[in-house]
Amino acid sequence: DDELNVGPYDEKSTWGCIKKHGDHYMFELAEPPKGERAPVVSFRSTKAELKSIHFHAPSEHQVEKHEFCAEFHLVHEICSQGAPGDKYGQEPSSKIVIGVFANAVDDKDALQSLSLEFCTSLSTVKNSEEDCCVSAPFSFNELLKDAYSKLQRFYHYRGSLTTGTHDEVVSWFVLKEQISISSSMQDKIKLLDQPTRELQAMNRRIVLSKD
């Protein structure tokens, strides 16, 4: 019952547009073609549709004071819930965000192609003198390779957005299993200077751990 499930994350690339929101840059998914559906995450009786992706470097979450070189955020909007009386009740949040830690390694098999295309498009938007958006594909095959096993080990809590007005509207799922990115990709990410919110106090939040 406490499994986190996604689909169709392991299919073909998803197209979208990279835009600037305040000081941050993110990938917003385009409407899927007729007959296809956007990636969806489900937890208990709640389902949420993927809307945007962005990252922070270094990571915004820490594990036992350990900071990771980057953290991807997959932002989902809740689209359906269990009916009143459902044994799990209504999810009080309006978003589900999956956090994926990344560390740099000197390995030719480390994540490169996905982040390279993503970073190149981000740089184009960042260096533009006017507001603009750049169309780009985003493949989940590498980011969530072996997705099912990765998604079954996570930290879960209810908290806030880490950008904008920091509204308390998020059910967070931070995956315990990190991904590897190439050292050269880490350098490209740092050059983008994507803001990272400073570490926040727990403020009575309860963090659940699932293995």
What are these regions (language model features)?
Residues 1-211:
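Alpha-carbonic anhydrase
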